[in-house]
Amino acid sequence: GKTASQATSLIVNRRTKFPSSSYAVMDGNYKYQYDRYNSVYRYVPFNGDIAGVCAASDNINPFVSPAGFTRGNIRNVYGMALETSRANRDDLYTNGINPIITPTGGGKVLLGDKTLLSRPSAFDRINVRRLFIILEKAIANAVQFSMFEFNDAVTRGNFVAQVEPFLRDVRASRGITDFRIICDTTNNPPSVIDRNEFRGDIFIKPNRSINFISLNFVAVASGVEFNEVVNAV
């Protein structure tokens, strides 16, 4: 058998064989699970479980992260092929591989929400990519009613009136922090209109999930006011 560090290196090397994509995710482990159809225990990839926690997240909102102790719990697992140290998990996560851990108290938890996008981008997180999939589908359904209408102020106003309430709802649900819709003569000049085209530009500020938590504890003397030391920390 291989050590955890050796196995981690092999997994990272395997990751390099895949192209960069925000539409793909990768974890680095196998689970030990009972196969009730054949009455044996066997190692099975976590792929189905990762899809399952994503599907379960849909019950809350598609744009929340499927990872963590709230939504990333994986059930009915009796063991894993690889138990990683923190250093191993850091190596995996740096390379876009989402670790699965055994926390104190038992159970298994997905502790990462990266996509396989190699370059720094908002789309290197699962929740952001899933958010934009939802937005693109919903807005595409709305814009189809503009087909074969006139590209004038009325049609452009109707488009904005359809999309804006939807994005406000997403913002209220914490999926995005802000947005802006541009659909006027600035992006629909005569040249666009003469080509029988219609343009709507939608700028989105997606919400980001917390991946790291830093806690700083400071002992304060009894006679000292808090506001005296807060800014000094």
Kindly give the residue locations of the regions a language model identified.
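Structured, hydrophobic secondary-structure cores that serve as assembly/anchoring elements
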Residues: 1-233
